[in-house]
Amino acid sequence: MDLSSQRQSPNGSRGFRLQAPLVDSVSCYCRVDSGLKTVVEARKFVPGSKLCIQPDINPNAHRRKNSKRERTRIQPPLLPGLPDDLAVACLIRVPRAEHRKLRLVCKRWYRLASGNFFYSQRKLLGMSEEWVYVFKRDRDGKISWNTFDPISQLWQPLPPVPREYSEAVGFGCAVLSGCHLYLFGGKDPLRGSMRRVIFYNARTNKWHRAPDMLRKRHFFGCCVINNCLYVAGGECEGIQRTLRSAEVYDPNKNRWSFIADMSTAMVPLIGVVYDKKWFLKGLGSHQLVMSEAYDPEVNSWSPVSDGMVAGWRNPCTSLNGRLYGLDCRDGCKLRVFDESTDSWNKFMDSKAHLGNSKSLEAAALVPLHNKLCIIRNNMSMSLVDVSNPDKNNPRLWENIAVKGQSKSILSNIWSSIAGRALKSHIVHCQVLQA
């Protein structure tokens, strides 16, 4: 900057001297090197004592900021004739199946229908919808997934499963925050055991990466307690084939941490969270059946040999503090664990035996709308109201999905035949809310 410019600057008359750089902000718009005109304009935004000389600062940055503010001020309303808060109150009532269409209307609707505020308001007002997400494996080992809307009773489209899990085996699946579905670990046919973690956001309908696990593992146990993801045991290629190690992922901290090791190495076969503890049952290093329970409050494992694990079979789940399991191959009977007698008791019977074929086998039992949802390998589902087991209630035990209701009857029959031939089966089943 030349001397004449400094004399003409008001800062010079006040006895201030240009120094570089005294600006304590990351945003500076002065561009002192461009001449007197810029310095004078810079006084509008930067105090005279904090002018700096930074030739790489963009002089249009503040202008763009103002322009953005102006655009926000004059942007059209979400719904013509309505204030935005009232428009949001209307849009959050749109059924979840139509949210994909909302995102196509305009950029403002896209941002709204993809943001946390939109879905937090739906949850606050009791309008969130639970959908069932099902992962299947066909005879060729390919993984596919579908989601079922129990309200419209239709299967909805989903983005493809990421390539790293399209043929993986022994991977875990869990839900955090009600809307994030995680896939983690497993064994890739080419790469072997993995530490990889990815998650699907039901609000945006997209996949994302998450921090890798601390240990490679496959065929391990996993659960969610207090919105933290726990994994334990399993196998890993190498000298120590069966693992004792366990770890936890905290989404708030976005990192994994080791927890106490299991008492013995184990490949878990079934697991459930019950009474604030994580119960696992599986095979030890010498193919012996073993059971352990983890208490997160004291970070310790302990062997279990009571009546619960003695009569424990998969699939099972806990709902409202009670532990339920299936008592029939096709899921037509339910049983419940009675803590007072330390035994499993018969609970409900649909009186509608479907058969013993592989396609009719009940593969998953999950809570849905405060009821129990039974999912079979042929993608048929039954919803059971266990809150009031009144035999006269016609909706006590109802079928909500008959394998692909969006298809014709002929295609359903063909799919059933093809399903038996392909020996496709369900690998994981979860419920996500949005």
UniProtKB/Swiss-Prot annotation:
Per-repeat ranges for Kelch: 129-178, 180-227, 229-276, 278-321, 325-371
GO biological process: regulation of phenylpropanoid metabolic process
Record-linked Pfam families: F-box (PF00646), Kelch_1 (PF01344)
Superkingdom in the source lineage: Eukaryota
Domain F-box: from-to ranges: 76-122
Keyword terms, alphabetized: Kelch repeat, Repeat
Name of the protein this chain belongs to: F-box/kelch-repeat protein At1g55270
Record organism: Arabidopsis thaliana (Mouse-ear cress)
Organism lineage: Eukaryota, Viridiplantae, Streptophyta, Embryophyta, Tracheophyta
